[in-house]
Amino acid sequence: VPSPDDTEATVARLTSMSSAEEPLTAGRDGLLSLLRNGQLPSRGAKAPQRERYQRIVAAAMELASEGGYDAVQMRAIADRAGVALGTVYRYFPSKNHMLVMGLLMVFEGMRSRFEDVAIPGDTPSERILFVLRKNTEVLEKDRPRYEALVRAFMFADASASAELDAFGALMTEMFAKTIGVEQISDDQLNAIRVIGDVWMSSLVSWVAGRISVDEVMAHLGLAVRLVFRRLGG
């Protein structure tokens, strides 16, 4: 028998699907552009709608910091953000979808930190390890929040495909900048993708408590050296 909370959530979800009051989150095309230009959830959204969207994501991030993945509940997000439950579902069909958007925002912040600075290191592998180390240190500073974000990344379904695609594109862009190339070759692109996959799989193990941050960096160091050895970097 469904609980009252389950029934309320179902009604809110169905109501949000039939409502035209709020715009849906943009598709995969141009999502990073919307994020960087402050236009989420869509180019046609009005200022109050964008402000509500940001409040919802911020509420989810705050709850994650306070209690980790399990503390991020749709009703709690609505209450914290001061919006109706249906509005939350209008933007995000699940908390995993919402937290993946939060993860995308965090990693965009990481990318922007290094956008206009000279990254230390004499070789591409040294520069990538520097960026990986600095970014992993950021994650360690608020472990409950970033555990929640990584768990959401693990559990996300097709409803978050636009955010997941944008995340992959962002990682590629960040590492391409790090190795210092404008036009990335196929071999470099494959190397970057391998490093990104190793980083995320190591973070999954960190979230599960199987390895420490030092071990994350040891795994990354080995992967970077092996991958870039054949590229001469």
Predicted features and spans:
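N-terminal intrinsically disordered/low-complexity leader segments
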Residues: 1-51, 232-233
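Short glycine/proline-centered loop/turn elements that form peptide/ligand docking sites
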Residues: 38-39, 43-44, 71-73, 95, ...
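Amphipathic alpha-helical packing segments from all-alpha helical-bundle domains
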Residues: 111, 157-200, 214-229
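Amphipathic alpha-helical segments used for helix-helix packing
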Residues: 136-158, 165, 173-176, 201-205
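Short, basic, alpha-helical segments at the C-terminal edge of helix-turn-helix-like DNA-binding modules
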Residues: 104-111
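Hydrophobic alpha-helical connector segments
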Residues: 101, 115-141, 195, 217
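Helix-turn-helix
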Residues: 55, 63-97, 101
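Short hydrophobic clusters on alpha-helical segments that form packing/core surfaces
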Residues: 52, 56-64, 110, 135, ...
